[in-house]
């Protein structure tokens, strides 16, 4: 699928586990477009944040079941990417947390 660079990365994931990975392994977590490939994620992160990406790992998270009264619905599945940066580089967006 042909995605624009700004459409690949949706938002950063800021959780306790993601923070531990960021500090220990230089891994940054993002929610990405469901159809984005690892190559597209790498290119998007390198262009948007001006860093060098060494590795990209992706996982698809299942959407949770949600209830409103007796009606049961489901949130959509989504994809997350764990991006490892070159030694000494960081993304300023995560530094304020």
From Swiss-Prot:
Keywords tagged on the record: Ribonucleoprotein, Ribosomal protein, RNA-binding, rRNA-binding
Any single Pfam family the record assigns to this protein: Ribosomal_L23
GO CC aspect terms: ribonucleoprotein complex; ribosome
GO BP annotations, alphabetical order: translation
Statement: the UniProt record of this protein carries the keyword tRNA processing: no
Keyword Repeat appears in the UniProt entry: no
UniProt superkingdom: Bacteria
Record-level Gene Ontology MF annotations: rRNA binding; structural constituent of ribosome
Entry's family note: Belongs to the universal ribosomal protein uL23 family.
HAMAP family: Ribosomal_uL23_B
Subunit structure: Part of the 50S ribosomal subunit. Contacts protein L29, and trigger factor when it is bound to the ribosome.
NCBIfam families reported for this sequence: PRK05738.1-3, PRK05738.2-4, PRK05738.3-2
Function: One of the early assembly proteins it binds 23S rRNA. One of the proteins that surrounds the polypeptide exit tunnel on the outside of the ribosome. Forms the main docking site for trigger factor binding to the ribosome.
Protein's name in the database: Large ribosomal subunit protein uL23
Species this protein is from: Anaeromyxobacter sp. (strain Fw109-5)
